[in-house]
């Protein structure tokens, strides 16, 4: 209870806690002669190395681990839209780095023209996926930072660069570097946030528990650790021996291709099941808790997540199993009153009947309905785990408290 009400109490010490825990885990692995238990953490969904943006192509997992280079705004948009990079926090990070990459070819010397170019690029990238709020959040943060910098030139004639000795240097180039720096801050903050959510989430779980998860909210969906899989990884390093059941997550099979791959790679006891098997494993008494991520949470606690999440939540309620939704504060949208106002992305029907098969698995011309997300009503959510603490109902009151500090 103290941890829940403290809110930010441990947040200031998260980096220290993370360094200490990671050092202890490395020491334990070294003693066991196994340095690769968490090698999955080396596969960041977005990397920025030697001025190159690289994205792990998650559509090729688990068969291939391939990074692709992002050179234009179109590359970044396509990578997000086609799910080469996915997961709400990860696409926020990708959008931020992508904004910088998109501005490298800007050759002008007027800061106001540069600002307009950034605005147009940001608006374009924001259309890649409509449901997850992290894209717009990250892009707005970058734009706000740029506005503060450019405001210094508001009085400059015609928006030209200042050329006095005091302001020597190319301010447009400086602005570009500031965008890169902001992207790096967003990545580092997400890594710290995921670790904090892992610590909070682990406090709700006990060794040996059976845990069901849906879709993929692991390390390749975030900067590192994951959201709802973070406590699984921390528990693995601390000997909790969780038994995880991963829904395959139709139609794009993120649970089968990504979650089971991540967890197996990390030595976690994971069992893959079809989505329509969630009820029977609950009825069998194999599930003690459900953990899921979130792509956008409304002010009242309704949470949009991968299609099928709502059904799992309803089942958990029926069987008396706690349902925990992991939501970084960057994913909480207080401007959206309820889940009814969250836009739901609709995707092409081929993902249902053709994408994973050698031959179409449905009659030619059949109509399809393929929403990428559904909204879980707040009444089915036992608790919301954020990097600032554990939030319980009433969500319309307590979620706002996270932003009062």
Question: Language-model features: where?
Answer:
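Positively charged, low-complexity intrinsically disordered leader regions
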Residues: 37-78
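Short, hydrophobic/aliphatic alpha-helical segments
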Residues: 68-84, 203-211, 355-365
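Acidic-glycine-rich active-site phosphate/pyrophosphate-binding loop
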Residues: 64-75, 174, 206-207, 259, ...
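Short beta-strand segments
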Residues: 56, 94, 138, 212-216, ...
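Conserved phosphate- and dinucleotide-binding cores of soluble alpha/beta proteins
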Residues: 241, 248-405
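N-terminal active-site beta-alpha-beta segment that forms phosphate/nucleotide-binding
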Residues: 78, 84-273
């Amino acid at each position: 209870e103290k941890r829940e009400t403290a809110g930010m109490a441990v947040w200031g010490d998260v980096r220290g806690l993370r360094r200490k825990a990671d050092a202890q885990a490395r020491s334990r692995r070294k003693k066991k002669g196994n340095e690769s238990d968490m090698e999955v953490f080396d596969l960041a969904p977005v990397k920025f190395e030697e001025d190159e943006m690289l994205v792990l192509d998650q559509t090729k997992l688990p068969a291939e681990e391939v990074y692709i280079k992002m050179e234009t705004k179109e590359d970044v948009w396509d990578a997000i839209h086609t799910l080469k990079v996915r997961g709400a926090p990860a696409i926020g990070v990708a959008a931020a780095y992508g904004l910088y990459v998109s501005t490298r070819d800007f050759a002008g010397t007027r800061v106001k023209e540069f600002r307009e170019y950034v605005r147009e690029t940001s608006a374009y990238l924001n259309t890649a996926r409509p449901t997850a709020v992290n894209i717009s959040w990250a892009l707005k943060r970058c734009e706000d930072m740029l506005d503060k910098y450019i405001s210094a030139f508001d009085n400059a004639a015609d928006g030209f660069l200042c050329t006095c000795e005091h302001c020597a240097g190319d301010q447009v180039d400086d602005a570009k570097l500031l965008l890169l720096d902001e992207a790096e801050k967003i990545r580092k903050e997400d890594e710290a946030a995921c670790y904090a959510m892992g610590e909070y989430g682990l406090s709700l779980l006990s060794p040996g528990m059976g845990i069901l998860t849906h879709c993929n909210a692991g390390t390749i969906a975030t900067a590192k650790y994951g959201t709802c899989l973070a406590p699984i990884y921390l528990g693995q390093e601390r000997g909790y021996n969780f038994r995880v059941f991963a829904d395959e997550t139709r139609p794009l099979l993120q649970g089968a291709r990504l979650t089971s791959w991540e967890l197996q790679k990390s030595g976690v006891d994971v069992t893959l099941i079809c989505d329509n098997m969630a009820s029977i494993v609950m009825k069998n008494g194999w599930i003690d808790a459900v953990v899921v991520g979130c792509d956008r949470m409304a002010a009242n606690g309704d949470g949009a997540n991968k299609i099928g999440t709502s059904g799992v939540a309803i089942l958990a309620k029926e069987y008396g199993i706690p349902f925990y939704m992991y939501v970084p504060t960057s994913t909480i949208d207080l401007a959206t009153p309820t889940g009814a106002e969250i836009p739901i992305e609709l995707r092409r029907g081929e993902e249902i009947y053709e994408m994973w098969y050698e031959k179409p698995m449905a009659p030619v011309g059949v109509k399809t309905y393929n929403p990428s997300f559904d909204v879980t009503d707040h009444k089915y959510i036992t608790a919301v785990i954020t990097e600032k603490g554990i939030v319980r109902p009433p969500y319309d009151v307590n979620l706002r408290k996270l932003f009062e500090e």
